[in-house]
């Protein structure tokens, strides 16, 4: 939502932005902000939709350590805007090579509008703001829908992409790492927080490989759902980790961030645990 106030000079658009207390994530506030004139090289996105999931919480929890708070800095100390995957349209441009009306997929804040200093790329735009310089290119990339080979039109398809696409890529890259290392000599992989989207992406890729047994570990509440997905050879609950045979080599990938559960895995398998990868923190309370 937005409001327009008229002055003698020009209209001032007030847009809503959502801010989180960086040290008390349950504390949030909505702020009305006026939009300044665009500087040369800048564009203004109107955010249309974004996905809010447990993974979004991870961005906030690890915001200081991994720099997620720096994606879209807040002017007021102690507050921040959480990034989320979604879709937005360019509604104003002060860049000679970027037209209004184009729609893009990428990282956006939980705000109605966001201004970026951009550079055109082969498939879209890249955020060139100095506060983003230290971030990996994948986090700064915005893909234009008419240049996106994976784009599917329609609200349902766009919702699914916002929910799943980014984390499937994370799972794919993690599985590719294990494959490049021949699964460290193991023929089994234990996937913690198996119902999470990154885990499902990983398991989908691992399940396609010959000779790799994929064991999902999840909560009792999520067991039936995780089993029904069909990409795990076996699904067990956290309390049943000790029932998995520990005599043969195994590797693990943890999306939960639960130190107590991961410690049980290391204790149970001992030297047979050939590699332990940690990604994310889905068990944050």
Language model: regions and residue ranges:
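Conserved N-terminal Rossmann-fold NAD(P)-binding element of oxidoreductases
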Residues: 189-193
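Glycine-rich beta-strand-centered segment in the early N-terminal region that forms part
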Residues: 36-50, 64-115
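NAD(P)H dinucleotide-binding glycine-rich loop of Rossmann-like/cofactor-binding domains
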Residues: 107-187
